[in-house]
Swiss-Prot record:
InterPro entries: Haemerythrin (IPR002063), Hemerythrin (IPR050669), Hemerythrin-like (IPR012312), Hemerythrin-like_sf (IPR035938). Fe cation 1 binds at residues 54, 84, 88, 147. This is Hemerythrin-like protein. Belongs to the hemerythrin family. The lineage of its organism: Eukaryota, Metazoa, Cnidaria, Anthozoa, Hexacorallia. Fe cation 2 binds at residues 88, 109, 113, 142, 147. Oxygen-binding protein. The oxygen-binding site contains two iron atoms. One of its GO terms (molecular function) is oxygen carrier activity. PANTHER family: BACTERIOHEMERYTHRIN (PTHR37164:SF1). CDD domains: Hemerythrin-like.
Length: 156
């Protein structure tokens, strides 16, 4: 399956570009992340509810991998992503309304969420290595770049 490149909705400022995930030619294409096996402190956005949800997203992707072909695991992952995106977007909207977060970033962030949900849904129940690796790379890239942009800018 030809998967699309992992896209960013805006230029990522250098402080948010994680050197282990990006090569010198791109802001958005992560290097292979097979060395990552779980959420760790380097993924903290410093909002407890969002950090907890991010941990859970790692868990559901690994669960899909462990239970290949299990429709329940895929459905649980899709629900976890959708639920997290709903929570995160609501928190971000408050930041936009308070003037702490840029509206263009918010819109781009929501677009990235929607594109991922659409793509994940298109995978069906039998995710192979490519789809699972893509999902994990997308998650890592999204947290380390796109989500890091809102640190300190949300109203809870």
């Amino acid at each position: 399956m030809g998967l699309p490149p992992i896209e960013c909705p805006f230029d990522i400022p250098k402080p948010f570009r994680h050197p282990d995930l990006f090569d010198k030619f791109s802001n958005c294409d992560p290097l292979p992340i097979f060395f990552l096996n779980r959420w760790n402190e380097s993924f903290k956005v410093f909002y407890q509810n969002l950090d907890d949800e991010h941990r859970g997203l790692f868990d559901v992707v690994f669960d899909v991998d462990a239970k290949r072909g299990d429709a329940g695991a895929v459905s649980k992952a899709a629900s976890a992503f959708k639920g997290h995106f709903t929570t995160e977007e609501a928190e971000m909207k408050k930041g936009v309304d308070a003037g702490k977060l840029d509206g263009a970033h918010y819109k781009g962030h929501c677009t990235a969420h929607n594109k991922f949900l659409e793509l994940f849904g298109s995978f069906g129940n039998n995710l192979g290595d490519d789809e699972i690796n893509y999902s994990m790379k997308w998650l890592v890239n999204h947290i380390k770049s796109t989500d890091f942009h809102y640190k300190g800018k949300l109203i809870q």
